[in-house]
């Protein structure tokens, strides 16, 4: 999961290209331990973003993403075209992605708590009563992008607060994916 900045302010970016400035990863090991990785930078951080993402992601295994075609996969392909030297590694990452939204989008799983929607925020309450976006300072991607757009205009203390709020929101997204994934596994076990 990462949030994006829609105005292309840097060299080698086209109109309406998106600047990836933040990501959050939760990596689950085979023994069930969960480790969180976070990246956040301002300015032109594309190269460092790519390098850190490649370093933080395990070299093998499935990468679960939610609604990946219009966001994560598209952005990585865009970065691969801007930085050819990373194309092979970014293409490899894309090839390991699996879209966690598909069972919900296809109607293979439905719960009335979803209220006819299948966004991550709509399905999280189905699988957890305790984890919620409602307590966060930033509760959606648009607010995260707006906060980022004003980031460089802030003083150092405000920057820390904005960075923490954006990072916490994005961390919630990837943790929610973890909860939903394990919730689906339990549903299959209990209803098989």
Where are these regions (language model features)?
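Acidic, Mg2+-coordinating catalytic module of metal-dependent nucleases/exonucleases
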Residues: 123-192
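Short amphipathic alpha-helical segments
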Residues: 9-10, 76-78, 182
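Metal-dependent catalytic core segments for phosphate chemistry
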Residues: 1-49
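Conserved DEDDh/DEDDy metal-dependent 3′-5′ exonuclease domain
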Residues: 27-29, 35-142
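Short, well-ordered loop/turn elements at secondary-structure boundaries
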Residues: 19-21, 57-60, 171
């Amino acid at each position: 999961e990462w949030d994006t900045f829609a105005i292309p302010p840097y060299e080698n970016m086209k109109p309406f290209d998106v600047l990836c400035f933040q990501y959050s990863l939760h990596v689950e090991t085979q023994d069930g331990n969960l480790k969180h990785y976070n990246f956040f930078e301002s300015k032109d951080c594309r190269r460092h973003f790519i390098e850190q993402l490649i370093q933080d992601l395990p070299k093998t295994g499935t990468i679960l993403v939610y609604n990946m075609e219009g966001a994560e996969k598209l952005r990585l392909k865009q970065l691969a075209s801007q930085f050819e030297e990373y194309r092979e590694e970014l293409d490899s990452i894309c090839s390991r992605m699996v879209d966690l939204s598909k069972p919900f989008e296809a109607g293979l799983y439905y719960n009335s708590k979803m209220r006819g929607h299948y966004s991550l925020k709509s399905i999280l309450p189905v699988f957890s009563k305790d984890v919620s976006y409602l307590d966060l300072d930033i509760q959606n991607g648009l607010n995260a992008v707006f906060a980022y757009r004003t980031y460089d205009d802030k003083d150092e203390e405000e920057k820390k607060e904005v960075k923490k709020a954006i990072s916490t929101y994005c961390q919630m997204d990837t943790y929610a994916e973890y909860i939903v994934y394990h919730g689906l596994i339990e549903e299959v076990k209990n209803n098989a």
